[in-house]
Amino acid sequence: MAIINMSDLDLQGKRVLIREDLNVPVSNGVVTSDARLRASLPTIELALAKGAAVMVMSHLGRPTEGEYNPEYSMQPVVDYLAKALSCPVSLATDYLDGVDVAVGEVVVFENVRFNVGEGKNNEELSQKMAALCDVYVMDAFGTAHRAQASTHGVGMFAPIACAGPLLAQELDALGKALDNPARPMVAIVGGSKVSTKLTVLESLSGIVDQLVVGGGIANTFIAAAGYNVGKSLYEADLIDEAKRLVANAKSRGADIPVPTDVVVAGEFSPTAAATLKSVSEVADSEMIFDIGPDSAEALAKIIESAGTIVWNGPVGVFEFDQFGEGTKRIAQAIADSKAFSIAGGGDTLAAVDKYGIADKVSYISTGGGAFLEFLEGKELPAVAMLEKRGA
C-alpha cells in the first residue's frame, strides 16, 4: 500500500491536524474508560516531539448533527489530555475559520459532529478543515470505514495526508493476519445473529482452515446439523445458508465444527441454573447459552495448533459466569498459543479484559465496524483516500 506514514515526515514548525478516535464514555463530565485516549497518546506525543503545532479532532457520541450539545462536548477529553500531556492543551469551539496554535501546543477541536455536513462528507466543510493544516493525519481506525468530512474529505484537500502510527499498526496487523497468514488459520466468530455476520462468515470461510462459530450464530449451525435447539436464539431462515457455508468450507478441506455438548438453561438471567447436555439432548423448553467442556477442549486443541488466529465474538453468554466457561477456555487457549493472534469487536475486548489476556494477544484492534468490514474484504474509505494521496 502506497500510504505515507506520519513517522516518516519532517513536521518541524508544521501545523498538524490529527483525526483520532476519542469517542469515549463520559459520566458527569469525567471520562470513565480511557482505552482509546491512551491508544492515541503516542501519536500526539510523536507529533509534538517532531516540533509540530498540533490540532486534534474526533467525534464523541451521537449528537444531532449541526447542533451544539454540552452532553457531547470534547471538554472531558481536553481535561484528560491536559493531565496526560506535558504541554498546554485547550479546546477550540469555533475553529473552521482559523485557529491559533503554537509549536508545542495541542488544540482539541470541539466534536466534529457539531458541524453540518460531517456525516455526508460535505466538500465545503472538508476544504475548511484542510485549510487549517499543513499535514492531515488519519489515525482513527475505528472510523476508517466511514466516508465523512473529518475522516475522508479533509484528506482529499489537505496539502499532505498520511496515516498515524495507530492506524499504520492496525493495517499492518490485519494485513499480516489476512493477506499472508501463517497456517493453519483459525477464525472464531461469535455474536447473536448469522445475518449481521453473514458477509464476514462468507469471506472467512473462503480463507481459513477452521471457522469456529459461537453464540447465537452457533445455534443456527447446530440447527442446520439437524439438532433441536429448543427456545434458543437462532435464525431458521438462514439454516440453508449455514449448510451452504459448511459445504463450501468442506469442499476446500476446511471445517466449521459444531459443538458436541452445550450448556443450557430455562431462562436468560444472571441467576439461571446451568445444565450440561449433549447437543442431541436439548429439550424444547431450553436455551443454549454456552458450549460444553468437551467442545471447548476440542476448540482449544484447534487453537493450539494454529499459526494465525482471528477472534471476533464470544462463544457464550460470558457476562454470566455460569455460561462463560467456553469463552474463558478459548481465551486461555489463545493466550497460550504461539500463533499470531488478533482480536477485535466490543464483546471480544470485554472478554479479553475479563479473562486478563490483553498482553497475550498479538494485536487488539481498536475498531468495531471497521474491523468487521476489513474482515469482509471491503475497501475502507479512509484507507482508500490515504492510498490515493500516497500514490
From Swiss-Prot:
GO terms for molecular function: ADP binding; ATP binding; phosphoglycerate kinase activity. ATP binds at residues 197, 319, 345-348. Belongs to the phosphoglycerate kinase family. The lineage of its organism: Bacteria, Pseudomonadati, Pseudomonadota, Gammaproteobacteria, Alteromonadales. Pfam families: PGK (PF00162). Monomer. The keyword Transcription does not apply. The gene is pgk. Substrate binds at residues 21-23, 36, 59-62, 113, 146. This is Phosphoglycerate kinase. It catalyses: (2R)-3-phosphoglycerate + ATP = (2R)-3-phospho-glyceroyl phosphate + ADP. SUPFAM superfamilies: Phosphoglycerate kinase. GO terms for biological process: gluconeogenesis; glycolytic process. GO terms for cellular component: cytosol.
